[in-house]
Amino acid sequence: MPRKGNVPKREVLADPIHGSMVVAKLINSVMLDGKKGTAQNIVYGAFDIIKERAEENPVEVFEKAMNNIMPVLEVKARRVGGANYQVPIEVRPERRQTLGLRWLVKYTRARGEKGMIEKLAKEIMDAANNTGSSVKKKEDTHKMAEANKAFAHYRW
C-alpha cells in the first residue's frame, strides 16, 4: 500500500485491429520481456486459426472463452483464533478478468502442441467449448469455495 495516497490505474488502450480492451490485455499477458510485437503476432495468429477452424468471429469466440474461464468465487486464507480458514469470497469484476487471462496464458504455455500460436488457438477454442485446463482451474476454484461455504461468516 502506498503511503502517499492512491496511485491512479493506468488505462490500457484498445488493440488496434479489433478495438477490444480485453484483446489488448491478452496481448499484454502473452508478452514476455517487453516484446509486444511478438505477442501481437501470437494473438493475431491464434485469432486467424480460430477464424479458419471455427468459422466465427474470433473476438466473439475469445469473449465466450473468457466468460467460461472467469471465476465468480474464490477462497482467501483468514486466520481466526490460531487456525487458518479458507473463506469463500466473491471476486471483483476486474480481478475476474485478470484471473481469467492469467489462467488462460498459464495453461496455454503448459500445453503440448508445437508453437505458441497453435497452443493459444486451441486453448481458446477449448475454453469456448467449456473444456480445457483453464476451465478446469475455474471449476476447481469454485469447488474449493463450495467446500468451504461453512466458513463464509468469517468474511471481512
From Swiss-Prot:
Protein's job: One of the primary rRNA binding proteins, it binds directly to 16S rRNA where it nucleates assembly of the head domain of the 30S subunit. Is located at the subunit interface close to the decoding center, probably blocks exit of the E-site tRNA.
Entries under PROSITE patterns matching the protein: RIBOSOMAL_S7
One GO CC annotation: small ribosomal subunit
Highest rank taxon of the organism: Bacteria
Gene Ontology BP annotations: translation
Keywords on record: Ribonucleoprotein, Ribosomal protein, RNA-binding, rRNA-binding, tRNA-binding
Highest classification ranks of the organism: Bacteria, Bacillati, Bacillota, Clostridia, Peptostreptococcales
Protein name, per record: Small ribosomal subunit protein uS7
Source organism (scientific name): Alkaliphilus metalliredigens (strain QYMF)
Disulfide bond residue pairs: none
Subunit structure: Part of the 30S ribosomal subunit. Contacts proteins S9 and S11.
Alphabetical list of InterPro entries matching this protein: Ribosomal_uS7, Ribosomal_uS7_bac/org-type, Ribosomal_uS7_CS, Ribosomal_uS7_dom, Ribosomal_uS7_dom_sf
Pfam family, one: Ribosomal_S7
